Amino acid sequence: MAVDIQYSYSSMAPSLRRERFTFKISPKLSKPLRPCIQLGSKDEASGMVAPAVQEKKVKKRVSFADNQGLALTMVKVFSEFDDPLDIPFNITELLDNIVSLTTAESESFVLDFPQPSADYLDFRNRLQTNHVCLENCVLKDKAIAGTVKVQNLAFEKVVKIRMTFDTWKSFTDFPCQYVKDTYAGSDRDTFSFDISLPEKIQSYERMEFAVCYECNGQAYWDSNKGKNYRITRAELRSSPGKIEPYNGPDFGISFDQFGSPRCSFGLFPEWPSYLGYEKLGPYY
């Protein structure tokens, strides 16, 4: 945009007063300067930030091979190897190990009788009646070990285990060793035994033993109520069946529906009754 500026000089000479000087200023073609103070948008002025433009997510698409002209399945055919595979595992060794393991399990032995001391009342009655009774017995590494309780009838005494490995075609007596009692003055003595079992035992033969106690020229036996203490193979162990009824004397005891005795005098005759309590001395 052109700007005309006129100047008049009245104080100049008369010859120059009539002359006018005209200056014409044309604008520059350069871009105008930006102001140094910039006003933000209404959102920035109010403290709010304009949300960023969300990118458009590309939807996933599933395409199958048959849509692209390919096969859905891939078949691979393997041919036999020319050289045999070197398999480190031999199937024959596996079968031999299985057979040996089965044989070892079948040749393992177990006790075919309960621990005598598990039923303390029966154990005490047998000890008082027979003066000798097997207390405990265990099997360990082709050996049998246990303890025997005897009544202290005399100082000199001999305790031995009479055992057979061929159904009493022959037998062997193994002496027991005296075990010092912790409590002095007891009327019972303890003996221990440790017997090694043979390497080869025929499957049709029975292993049995009984306990013999010799004192004052007499022999007392504990033969497990006439059945002997049997050691049998694990596969031939007798299954627990019905408990044999007790054929001993009847003390007038009646049992309830749960098998508990209604009268304790027959099972525990040494327990003092209420009527005779004042006439009895101390129990020890």
Curated annotation (Swiss-Prot):
Database matches in PROSITE patterns: CBM21
Residue window of motif PP1-binding motif: 61-64
Occurrences of domain CBM21 (ranges): 124-232
One cellular component (GO) term of this entry: protein phosphatase type 1 complex
Record carries keyword Metal-binding: no
Keywords carried by this UniProt record: Carbohydrate metabolism, Glycogen metabolism, Phosphoprotein
Induction: Up-regulated by TITF1.
Annotated TM spans: none
Pfam families given in the database record: CBM_21 (PF03370)
Molecular function terms from GO: [phosphorylase] phosphatase activity; enzyme binding; protein phosphatase regulator activity
Presence of the UniProt keyword Transmembrane helix in the record: no
Taxonomic superkingdom: Eukaryota
Modified residues (Phosphoserine): S260
InterPro entries reported for this sequence: CBM21_dom, CBM21_dom_sf, Pase-1_reg-su_3B/C/D_met, PP1_3B, PP1_regulatory_subunit_3
Tissue expression remark: Highly expressed in liver (at protein level). Expressed predominantly in liver. Expressed moderately in heart. Expressed weakly in prostate, stomach, thyroid, lung, kidney, spleen and skeletal muscle.
Biological process according to GO: glycogen metabolic process; negative regulation of glycogen catabolic process; positive regulation of glycogen biosynthetic process
Quaternary structure note: Interacts with glycogen, PPP1CC catalytic subunit of PP1 and PYGL. Associates with glycogen particles. Forms complexes with debranching enzyme, glycogen phosphorylase, glycogen synthase and phosphorylase kinase which is necessary for its regulation of PP1 activity.
PANTHER family (alphabetical): PROTEIN PHOSPHATASE 1 REGULATORY SUBUNIT, PROTEIN PHOSPHATASE 1 REGULATORY SUBUNIT 3B
Domain remark text: The N-terminal region is required for binding to PP1, the central region is required for binding to glycogen and the C-terminal region is required for binding to PYGL.
Function as written in the Swiss-Prot or TrEMBL entry: Acts as a glycogen-targeting subunit for phosphatase PP1. Facilitates interaction of the PP1 with enzymes of the glycogen metabolism and regulates its activity. Suppresses the rate at which PP1 dephosphorylates (inactivates) glycogen phosphorylase and enhances the rate at which it activates glycogen synthase and therefore limits glycogen breakdown. Its activity is inhibited by PYGL, resulting in inhibition of the glycogen synthase and glycogen phosphorylase phosphatase activities of PP1. Dramatically increases basal and insulin-stimulated glycogen synthesis upon overexpression in hepatocytes.
Protein name: Protein phosphatase 1 regulatory subunit 3B
Gene designation per UniProt: Ppp1r3b
